[in-house]
């Protein structure tokens, strides 16, 4: 089953399914008709020799320079060559794939003036899983993601690099091996490829998919810790959460009770102590707030995924043709959302690290051995895993600083305010990876802690998780290289975000 694109109703869930099931894309006929109509308008502009930005003129400061008609195609090719100034390591293959899908989807709205040949080239790259090599640094997030999208565009015309079947190679060689011609850019098409927010948005989509799964995984991992510390279940009672008027908080509380149902390790208030520390007692409030952030981010990302963020935009309404220069390429809405994502997801690791501390600290972990060491003194046990978690959490605090509060003028001060949304997206994904590793550390330690408490006392649902993860995380019987355990759990958690 293919993902049908129409420029209007693409969702994050559909992207997730496409990645998980290795789906292809196809274009609905109505959308293709819109593409053809908008291209006809561009062709008419050229035939009538009208002065229109980016079609018959130069770009940015050169917008007043008229271009000779026989140079229109050169103009577009020069644009993507000169703008391909990306720096550093490339976005991963999933981000490159989503970037192509999102750029294609916005063209299908019929406001970009591209040819059906360009649409078909994007479909070919997507379905063949030819991933453009797109350096992740170098975008200001307005006028859109110019540098990253220029690298994407280069691949389509056979001048860039791609990853194909796991091998980094020249795009021209891959196209030749597949008997596919490079695309020849027509008037407006270079600009239509690079004027948009698809780099920041695609990285944001991948961050969201993985962060959402981590938010759910954080609950069962916390439930293991809760049982290891004989946590009090009363704090998750629905009465408490209904009066907070937060559906996300209530949902987390209900799921925590579900994870803990039937456990003989949990306690009631007053049984061992009256109250738990906040990192246990306030899981619904903290994790629930993160879900609120995720819901907000999802709404903003899906809005942008189906937006026309080209410039200029072409309209054909009521027999009137309009070509309007605007600023839909400005990434401010996405930048704000991704900065919010950074904060909301960071807190999942912040509170996780505090639970880790309670598991390993002999002054806080009840009758568990210090650092869960099999032989305290001779063996350090989980001591440095807590250090690693603390380091990642502190790094997240720096990364969570909002990128969108910064701006720097560019293009001779014509583009005098920019979003920095792509910086927010890159930092956001680094935070997601850090959070995943912190939760992996809590998981490794909590597995050992509940084993010491007695696996038979666990709730049925968390016992199943214990058994699942013990398949590849052995008990701690002596000191070993725990970084291997952390990595295998982190990788497993990541794969769970894309389960088929």
From Swiss-Prot:
Pathway: Amino-acid degradation; L-histidine degradation into L-glutamate; N-formimidoyl-L-glutamate from L-histidine: step 1/3. Keywords: Cytoplasm, Histidine metabolism, Lyase. The gene is hutH. The lineage of its organism: Bacteria, Bacillati, Bacillota, Bacilli, Bacillales. One of its GO terms (biological process) is L-histidine catabolic process to glutamate and formate. Gene3D superfamilies: Fumarase/aspartase (Central domain) (1.20.200.10), Fumarase/aspartase (N-terminal domain) (1.10.275.10). It catalyses: L-histidine = trans-urocanate + NH4(+). It is found in: Cytoplasm. Belongs to the PAL/histidase family. This is Histidine ammonia-lyase. It comes from Macrococcus caseolyticus (strain JCSC5402).
């Amino acid at each position: 089953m293919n993902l049908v694109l129409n420029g209007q109703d693409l969702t994050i869930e559909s992207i997730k399914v496409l990645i998980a099931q290795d789906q292809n894309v196809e274009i609905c006929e109505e959308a293709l008709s819109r593409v053809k109509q908008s291209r006809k308008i561009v062709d008419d502009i050229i035939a009538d020799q009208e002065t229109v930005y980016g079609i018959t003129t130069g770009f940015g400061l050169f917008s007043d320079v008229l271009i000779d008609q026989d140079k229109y195609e050169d103009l577009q090719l020069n644009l993507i060559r000169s703008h391909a100034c990306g720096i550093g390591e490339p976005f991963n293959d999933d981000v490159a794939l989503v970037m192509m899908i999102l750029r294609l989807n916005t063209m299908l709205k019929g406001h970009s003036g591209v040819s059906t040949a360009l649409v078909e080239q994007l479909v070919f790259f997507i379905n063949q899983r030819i991933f453009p090599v797109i350096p992740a640094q170098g975008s200001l997030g307005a006028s859109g993601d110019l540098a990253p999208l220029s690298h994407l565009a280069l691949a389509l015309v056979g001048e860039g690099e791609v990853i194909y079947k796991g091998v980094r190679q020249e795009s021209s060689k891959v196209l030749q091996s597949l008997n596919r011609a490079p695309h020849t850019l027509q008037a407006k098409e270079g600009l239509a490829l690079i004027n948009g927010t698809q780099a920041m948005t695609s990285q944001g989509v991948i961050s969201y998919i993985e962060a959402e799964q981590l938010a759910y995984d954080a609950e069962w991992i916390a439930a293991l810790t809760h049982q290891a510390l004989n946590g009090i279940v009363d704090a998750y009672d629905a009465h408490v959460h209904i009066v907070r008027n937060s559906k996300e908080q209530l949902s987390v509380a209900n799921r925590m009770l579900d994870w803990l149902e039937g456990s003989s390790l949990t306690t009631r208030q007053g049984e061992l102590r009256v109250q738990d520390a906040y990192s246990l007692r306030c899981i619904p409030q903290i994790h629930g707030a993160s879900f609120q952030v995720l819901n907000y981010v999802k709404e903003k990302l899906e809005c942008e995924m189906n937006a026309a963020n080209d410039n200029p935009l072409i309209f054909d309404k009521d027999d009137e043709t309009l070509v309007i220069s605007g600023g839909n390429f400005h990434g401010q809405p996405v930048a704000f959302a991704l900065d919010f994502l950074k904060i909301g997801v960071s807190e999942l690791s912040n509170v996780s690290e505090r639970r880790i501390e309670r598991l390993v600290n002999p002054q806080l972990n009840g009758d568990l051995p210090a650092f869960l060491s099999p032989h305290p003194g001779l063996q350090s046990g989980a001591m440095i895993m807590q250090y690693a978690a603390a380091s990642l959490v502190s790094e997240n605090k720096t990364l969570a600083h909002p990128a969108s509060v910064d701006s720097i003028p560019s293009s001779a001060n014509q583009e005098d305010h920019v979003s920095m949304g792509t910086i927010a997206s890159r930092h956001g994904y680094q935070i997601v990876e850090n959070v995943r590793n912190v939760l992996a550390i809590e998981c490794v330690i909590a597995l050992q802690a509940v084993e010491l408490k007695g696996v038979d006392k666990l709730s049925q649902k968390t016992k199943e998780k214990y058994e699942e993860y013990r398949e590849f995380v052995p008990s701690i019987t002596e000191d070993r290289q725990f970084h291997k355990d952390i990595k295998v759990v982190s990788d497993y958690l990541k794969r769970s975000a894309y389960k088929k």
